[in-house]
Amino acid sequence: MSFSPPPTEVFDVIVVGGGHAGCEAAITAARLGLSTALFTLNLDRIAWQPCNPAVGGPAKSQLVHEVDALGGVIGRLADATAIQKRVLNASRGPAVWALRAQTDKRHYSREMLQLLHHTPNLALREAMVTGLEVDGDPEPAGQARITGVRTYFGSVYGAQAVVLTAGTFLGGRIWVGHQSMSAGRAGEQAAEGLTDALKQLGFQTDRLKTGTPARVDRRSIALDQLEAQPSDAADRFFSFDPTAWASGEQMSCHITRTTAATHQLIKDNLHLTAIYGGIIDSKGPRYCPSIEDKIVRFADKDSHQIFLEPEGRDTPEIYVQGFSTGLPETIQLELLRTLPGLEQCVMLRPAYSVDYDYLPATQLKPSLETKRVRGLFSAGQLNGTTGYEEAAAQGLVAGLNAARLIGGQEPVHFPRENSYIGTMIDDLVSQDLREPYRVLTSRSEYRLVLRGDNADRRLTPLGRELGLIDDRRWQLFNDKLQAMEEEKQRLETVRLKVSDPVASTVEKESGAPIRGSITLADLLRRSGVHSSDLVRHRLADAELPLAVREGAEIDIKYSGYLQRQQQQIDQVKRQSLRKLPADLDYASIGTLSREAREKLTAIQPTTLGQATHIPGVSQADLTALLLWLELQKRRSQKSESLASSTNSR
């Protein structure tokens, strides 16, 4: 190893990168009593939201609830800075309910910076980390140990553990059309040297791509001609801590759509993008495609929905969600003006793509420590994920396990059956993912169990055991548990009699008669009856917290689900050797996710067991495939039986 100068400073933990993963990692390690330093290229862009200024959404909100249940901060800050909140998938079952908050991005960043400044044991440093200090030979893997980092200007900082959370900054290059420049994101330099340092230690790196749409001036949009989308969930929050709740002035988003002119302009100029022009071939996020990808992949669609989302209360900037593009700047304004309501719009910032180096996460342990270098951890977009929520969850896990490594404690592994955090990490470290990973409810075979509302019941006891939950939060949690148990007991014992004044109204609304009497629990088990209906009919206490009422309702409605789900999982395990027909048309199986249909069609596994190892094919997909095979088997047996009966006549 090369000789290094004496360290300028020494810390227990160094976190490299000040995004959502880095902030959670640094705060977690510091709260566990470790002297921690967060290194970032720009202290004025802490926890910045360079793409969509929003937190939550399907599966992502569950992650945010889980991080909060473990003492993390993303949920608290989203609650404090929300300017619009909505519940997605509200008409479906609780497994896929999702809270989504439009946040004030500048306010969010300021709040995070203040939180970092006031966290004991945590120091902030603005510097570019370009190298890793290591003791021992990296070959064979696992023999080397991290001892610190080296910065661009030659300073060395010592540490027993280092967490890399560099986001899109490693070798980052932004593209607008065929023109490009070195940058981690618009206006900020890329990180130099760290990719080479990782390669010298024997790590494999690859390239991924993402992008962000243009920002337009709100004052130049005819919002009065567009459909408004106001907040509908001002009373719902990510955090389980009421002291974090805030209900400031809400702002509406607006909806427009692409037109035939939009599609034609894109088709005519596809060759001018870096991807379709063949200049770069990095994989972009499957579930957040550019508008060019939408037009190409969904050629049969005449129009695509576009959301106009405010970036904050004190800025006129509007984020054009669903309209990221790699087209040249000279075409982007013309393209924007094909959208209804934007005919006279002013473009404040052009859209761009960014491709960057990442560290395939199969090189990590489930603790997010690297397999090659002891004490070196990696989290966030560097691991190939996409999204602030995925990054925050990984940051918490990496910071936690870095602290435990230094303390001589066993790492914490999150099982996939107990959290979306565990599902995500299991997918990352066990599958050879070659495109940006986004958490989805369909990736979890346990999704009704892994709801947002019960994240505290699943994880807060663990957080308390690990030292991440203080006495006040622990008391809040236990008070909620007690209130829920009391409410469930009340619902199971209190009966509504047919002679009660509200009985006839309840019968009419539920569509079923009350024979003599019925417990409130059995009433809740009826389709379409909810705890809010009990409150409306004065059969439940309106002062009872919403989380308590809804939690009790869900527990009662879905009490038998766990057993049925476990039976399905066990059946999948037993069926791992089951042969798959060579001519199986996966594209025709509608219950499979789109990704699973594509991957299964391409690979054509011969057994169900082989299908379990295909990246992008989740346990939920395997269950759906197994059920489909069983259905086909029964249909075949029935046809054979009918044919046999006919022939015997």
Swiss-Prot record:
NAD(+) binds at residues 284-298. SUPFAM superfamilies: FAD/NAD(P)-binding domain. Gene3D superfamilies: FAD/NAD(P)-binding domain, GidA associated domain, C-terminal subdomain, tRNA uridine 5-carboxymethylaminomethyl modification enzyme MnmG/GidA. The keyword Chloroplast does not apply. GO terms for cellular component: cytoplasm. One of its GO terms (molecular function) is flavin adenine dinucleotide binding. It comes from the Bacteria. It is found in: Cytoplasm. Signal peptide: none annotated. Keywords: Cytoplasm, FAD, Flavoprotein, NAD, tRNA processing. Transmembrane segments: none annotated. GO terms for biological process: tRNA methylation; tRNA wobble uridine modification. Its cofactor is FAD. FAD binds at residues 17-22. The keyword Lyase does not apply. NCBIfam families: mnmG_gidA. NAD-binding protein involved in the addition of a carboxymethylaminomethyl (cmnm) group at the wobble position (U34) of certain tRNAs, forming tRNA-cmnm(5)s(2)U34. Homodimer. Heterotetramer of two MnmE and two MnmG subunits. Belongs to the MnmG family. HAMAP family: MnmG_GidA. This is tRNA uridine 5-carboxymethylaminomethyl modification enzyme MnmG. It comes from Synechococcus sp. (strain CC9311).
